[in-house]
Amino acid sequence: MTVSKSNQILSNDRDLENISNKNIEDIKEFINTANSRLDAIDSITNNSHAIAADAVTAMICENQDSVNTKISLDTTNKMSVCLRDGEIILRIVSYLLISDDESVLSKNCLKDLKNTYLALGVPLKNAIRVFELMRDATISDLKSTVNSMKGEKEFLSDLISNTEFQFERIINLLR
């Protein structure tokens, strides 16, 4: 080890001596809260298939006429696109909750979402309703995941409002 390297280590050791127990507790609390938040967000991606499938199914049950008209979700192709997009949207919301990187909203998959539904003949009101149902299910999933955790849960209200905000941004792309 060189002299300069050992001096650097000694200097860092002296700096660490100035860290109080309160600072260490604050750091531990920050790490625990961040880990809990990541666990909650991870539950969204783990349940994305079920959330998307349930939302599409619920929308069809609410709109029986949507499966009987000319512009319907009656084909396998249209249904698979809705399910695929639902899962993609949930992953995008998860990414936004972690990174808050708004550039993902300008990506082609979201910019062309409205055009895709129009080309397939999927009524935009139905697509919007699916995303609203997904938002509600995601928030419910977040609440149940966080409530089963031990420790501080103060981050939940911020996480829920941020989730609602991100879904609203995506829903507004369809309007």
Curated annotation (Swiss-Prot):
<dbReference type="GO" id="GO:0030089">
    <property type="term" value="C:phycobilisome"/>
</dbReference>
<dbReference type="Pfam" id="PF00502">
    <property type="entry name" value="Phycobilisome"/>
</dbReference>
<dbReference type="GO" id="GO:0015979">
    <property type="term" value="P:photosynthesis"/>
</dbReference>
<keyword id="KW-0157">Chromophore</keyword>
<protein>
    <recommendedName>
        <fullName>R-phycoerythrin subunit beta</fullName>
    </recommendedName>
</protein>
<dbReference type="InterPro" id="IPR009050">
    <property type="entry name" value="Globin-like_sf"/>
</dbReference>
<feature type="binding site" description="covalent">
    <location>
        <position position="82"/>
    </location>
    <ligand>
        <name>(2R,3E)-phycoerythrobilin</name>
    </ligand>
</feature>
<comment type="function">
    <text>Green-light absorbing phycoerythrin of unknown function.</text>
</comment>
<dbReference type="InterPro" id="IPR012128">
    <property type="entry name" value="Phycobilisome_asu/bsu"/>
</dbReference>
<dbReference type="InterPro" id="IPR038719">
    <property type="entry name" value="Phycobilisome_asu/bsu_sf"/>
</dbReference>
<comment type="subunit">
    <text>Homodimer.</text>
</comment>
<keyword id="KW-0089">Bile pigment</keyword>
<comment type="similarity">
    <text>Belongs to the phycobiliprotein family.</text>
</comment>
